[in-house]
Amino acid sequence: MDLYTFDSPEGIPESKYIPLDIMSDYSIGESIARIPELVRKAKSLNMKALALTDRTLSGAIEFYLLCKTNDIKPIIGQKIAFGNNEVNLLCKDLEAYKILCRHSLELQDANDFPMALSELRITKEDCEHFICITSYCTSELLTSFGDNLYRQVDFADVKNHPEKFDNLDTSHAVITNPVRYLEKEDYAALAAFKQSISENPSPTYPDNYFADDSEIIPFLTENNHLELAENTQRITEQIQFIFPENYFTTPEAHNRMRESLPDFEDAENQLRAIAVEGFEQKLNEFDNEQEAWDRLAYELEDIGNHHWEKVFLFHHEVTSWCRQNGIEVGPGRGSAPGSFVSYLLGITNVNPLKHGLVYERFLNSERLCYPDFDIDYDYERLPEVAEHLKEKYGEDFVVRIATYGRLKCWQTLEIAAKYLNYSAEEILPIKKIILDFCLPRVTFSRLLDSSSYLYKDVIPHWDGVKLQGFLRDKKNEKLVKIAQTLEFVKHNIGLYASGYIVTGDSIYTYIPVLKDSKTGWIYSEYTMNILEDVGLYKSDLLGLWELTKLKQLTEAISKKTGTPFNYKEIPLEDKETLEAFAKGKTTDVFQFEAPGMKKFLKKLEPDRFSDLVLMNALYRPGPFDYIPIAIDNKAAGNYRNDFPGCESILEETYGLPIYQEQIIQMAQILAGYSLAEGDMLRRAMGKKKLEVLMAKKAEFMERAPVTEIVSEKQAEEIFDIMIPFAGYAFNKSHAVAYTMMAYWEMYMKVHFPKEYRKIIKNFREELEEEDF
């Protein structure tokens, strides 16, 4: 999450008024004020505190961290419907936040179907942890909150009706100006947004902007009720809500993550026993048994040192259950296939020793990281996997993750045009230019900048002239203003497609949650990035159609041959399969069916599995330009060696460092880095920050002579050559695993063409005759 530090104001006295009724765009359809804008505004006004009172706690952590970064006291609150009344509950302390988390589902129901405070099971003892602000101080609220109850005096209301000050007990009253948008002129933008999402939108009020001292203090002074602003300060002083020190630092978040995972009895010994059993079962696969044993011991020690055993055991249980129930599991994804322990546990199906994969690319003791397993499952049976987790651990222990859709510029243009009664003929041509020639995420700042690369290199000249003319036309000024104001505003909430949070205790003890009315799944109010800060473990369950295809092919082939067929036992050096790749006959073969890929395969003439892995890694933006060089080097049989001592690790890529793992290993060979240090060097090279690169370069040059392979001068030259490769280098672990699936498919296509053709028809209607 980006934590911006906004400019501090100069010459502005500290604000006397603190806004205590603010809704952000996390309250979808009720507010268009984004949290960064709210905090920036508060800082510009020299406010030392700020409240957030959304319908949920979805924005609480983002708000808290951004306020803290800008030296503003964050006041976390929630707006809740009680009967016919609405209240703002402000958290006085951390316990109040935990209470809201525990009751989050009930509070969701309360906002949908208002109920009495007693029905929410919030006790009088709970109420002691809150400040309650409401327009209607009922006897129930007074009994529950006592001195923590304040009457809300609406600034716009008393400004228009000063007589409402008469007989007002101001000792427990505060002035508020509910904030639903930032500036006065943003009123139209909120009205337009409401109209776009509802046929019967709720009213939009012209006074719900971010008011400040310049308006409120003179008015209260004139009416002899300055104490209403002073009470906002008084409430602020009562707020002692703070997360523990270092709570959001990575080490602390990881400690909480370890503690929050489901428990496994004697996890360290259990992991070791399962890994050793897997080792013994796969013993005949290892060319060097001692090397394999040393790798196992090293990984187990590292996993144990960082106490990540439960993560491995969790994924071992899931993948084992899938195999027992006939659900296909992918060979691996991302950097996980680089772990030998993952392979022995059956989490992945790639032998990292055979393919030269590096464990430190997955888990690195030099940087703070956790075992992030992304696992593919049979697409059609993915729901069964999720249901298994829910049944095994409980629905309060396995929950989905929220994701928020944000408005893009072309969407906001449509919204503004509809609100201002533009015709379709006026707006559709402009929308078409944006969608045809610009990325969907293009921003207004780019569109309004006539010197932008969009108008030089992307949008055709006359279309650019038309677009610029429309956006700068005086008569469209209001439309553009509304559209710009709505850009990036949250407009819907959904479920993150693959992410699941798994905990050992009820999720309510950690975070606030909601319930999806369509699926019945409980899901976190926080997004994925926030959950990592909070310290909860995310497991990705990814559905992959290729695994569905492989399952169906396996069943068809087994039926034909009369014997069980296991595609995972297919030899990776089958001559006919490699020849089919070399001829470019890859239609309907996973990751290899693009026309350009077919062309390069014919030129490369792959004759080993590693050639296919290489092409898979190269055929993507960035390393694409190295394809002709790799082809020429393979054809020549010899090539220039820019990296002395690294011949053995670069042989499979014909002298080019194409894989991230190769960069790591080269640092070890040339400069004596550990593999963990080599991974840190690779990451630094990839980010291309000049000051970091210069420091790493000096370090590399200093360490290189120790290996006696290159001199300090040679090390400088080699470092400069490595930098562009490191920026484009691809994760070999991922390339090997996904190429393996492609190879399995091609093998079945070559050796069982009728069965392959029949199954493929289920996935697409038209087949190319010449490709079979």
Predicted regions and their residues:
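Alpha-helical scaffold/interaction cores of sigma-54-like transcription cofactors
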Residues: 2-772
